[in-house]
Amino acid sequence: MVQPDSSSLAEVLDRVLDKGVVVDVWARISLVGIEILTVEARVVAASVDTFLHYAEEIAKIEQAELTAGAEAAPTPEA
């Protein structure tokens, strides 16, 4: 019988900080059609280096989308 590899808490924490974890929560509580409570949360756990790397990549994607949208929009003729 093969034992699965066990990981220590330090190894798990190192992996989470290296790769990053995002937990996105959206919940609504209502009673008889009346909204009582809405919760929206996004929790990000990552090292600063990992966060900055992915923030740069997201900025590049958003800039490419803006550029593509500007090129596709018709220009008004005078």
UniProtKB/Swiss-Prot annotation:
How does the annotation summarize its subunit structure?
The gas vesicle shell is 2 nm thick and consists of a single layer of this protein. It forms helical ribs nearly perpendicular to the long axis of the vesicle. Modeled as antiparallel homodimers.
Say yes or no: keyword Nucleotidyltransferase present: no
Under the heading PANTHER family, the entry gives: GAS VESICLE PROTEIN A1 (PTHR35344:SF4), GAS VESICLE STRUCTURAL PROTEIN 2-RELATED (PTHR35344)
Coiled coil ranges (UniProt) are none
Which taxonomic lineage is given here?
Answer: Archaea, Methanobacteriati, Methanobacteriota, Stenosarchaea group, Halobacteria
Under HAMAP family, the record lists: Gas_vesicle_A
Main subcellular location of this protein, as a coarse class: other
Family to which this protein belongs: Belongs to the gas vesicle GvpA family.
Subcellular locations according to the entry:
Gas vesicle shell
Q: Which organism is it from?
A: Haloferax mediterranei (strain ATCC 33500 / DSM 1411 / JCM 8866 / NBRC 14739 / NCIMB 2177 / R-4)
Q: Which terms in the GO cellular component ontology are assigned? A: gas vesicle shell; vesicle membrane
Source organism superkingdom = Archaea
Please state what the annotation says regarding this protein's domains.
Answer: Infrared spectra studies suggest the major structural elements are 47% alpha-helix and 25% antiparallel beta-strands; it is thought the beta-strands make the hydrophobic interior surface.
Give the region (Beta-strand 1) as residue ranges.
23-31
Which residue stretches belong to region Beta-strand 2?
35-43
Chain positions covered by the region annotation Alpha helix 1: 9-19
Q: Where is the region Alpha helix 2?
A: 48-67
Q: Which GO terms describe its molecular function?
A: structural molecule activity
Q: What is this protein called?
A: Gas vesicle protein A
Upregulation: Transcription is controlled by the GvpD-GvpE pair. Transcripts are maximal at the beginning of stationary phase. Gas vesicle formation is maximally induced in stationary phase when grown in 20-25% total salt (NaCl, MgSO(4), KCl) (at protein level). Expressed from a single promoter upstream of gvpA; most transcripts stop at the gvpA terminator, with low read-through into downstream gvpC-gvpN-gvpO. Expression starts in early stationary phase and is maximal in stationary phase. Highly expressed in 25% salt, poorly expressed in 15% salt, no gas vesicles are formed at 15% salt.
What NCBIfam families does UniProt report for this protein, alphabetically?
Answer: halo_gas_GvpA, PRK09371.1
